[in-house]
Amino acid sequence: NKALRVLANPFMDLDKITAAPSPSPNRWSDKVPSREMTVEEIQEFITAFGKTAKLLKDAGVDGVEIHAVHEGYLLDQFTLKYVNQRTDEYGGSFENRYRFAVEIVKEIKKVCGQDFPVSLRYSVESKTKGFREGALPGESFTEAGRDMAESEKAAKYLQDAGYDMLNCDNGTYDAWYWAHPPIYMPENCNLEDAEHIRRFVDIPVVCAGRMEPGTAARSISEGKIDGAGFARQFLADQEWVSKMMDGREEDIRPCILCHNGCFNMCHYKGVPNDQDLSDSLHLARCAVNAETMQTDKHHIVKTASPKKEHIIGGGIGGMEAARVLKLRGHEPVIHEK
């Protein structure tokens, strides 16, 4: 919708200087360093979060989730000592570093009411050695960001500030593969840490990040977490939950954790965020599901005149052709030597 771009351009403009808790390198471009945010800008953000939440509530939304103390995003950067070098009320001490996130939830509760649910996306541990240097599973390293001891304190502190749920994984932009686990990360790589942090709060804790459904279900049934988060699998197969409930696991089209399609909203043809929203070919597509974000182009319609179709070769292309032809109502026959 091009009209929406008049209201808000949801992409980074790398020709403009970006802002951060303290002067720092830009994660996306070495040519444009980040400057320090002013207190006035921080207050403007806090007010904007409250106004936006109120608009959503008035529109009938039941609650909001703040993408905040998570994956090295802005509010998370404020909490991390290796990024936040401020000496004012938003830097230094534990309370000051978490002040931004605390004041946001308090503002939302003030304008929307104490009973309006506010969830927080939360990285239990940063798993980060330093700028652009993350840690791998099982690696011995010195944590530059939030370690477990601080996280235990922070989770309780954020709960007491007003957050109603923690939606957990791990990592920062410097260790992004914990929050968006690719194929080389182990299944359930964030579960142990989420289960641990659950013991320090009285609010629901959700875990995300390459969750195996059976393991997630057991953890929930045992009371170790309260929910599991899935995203990429829904791009691969929108009906996968229904298929599981019907005992049709073998029919589920699995996410292959490749990031070749779903990350293109951020990296468009190798250039971060340089993209036309109308170009559905590169808008959160999926390598294993052609219909994802391209339903107008690839929507399967039943034929009015079924035919017997012969396909020479039973490779990946031949099998996909047979599958689609069958869904369209034809009778495909594969010939393979």
What are these regions (language model features)?
Residues 334-337:
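Conserved acidic E/D residue at the C-terminus of a beta-strand in Rossmann-like folds
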Residues 1-312, 316-332:
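Flavin-dependent oxidoreductase catalytic cores
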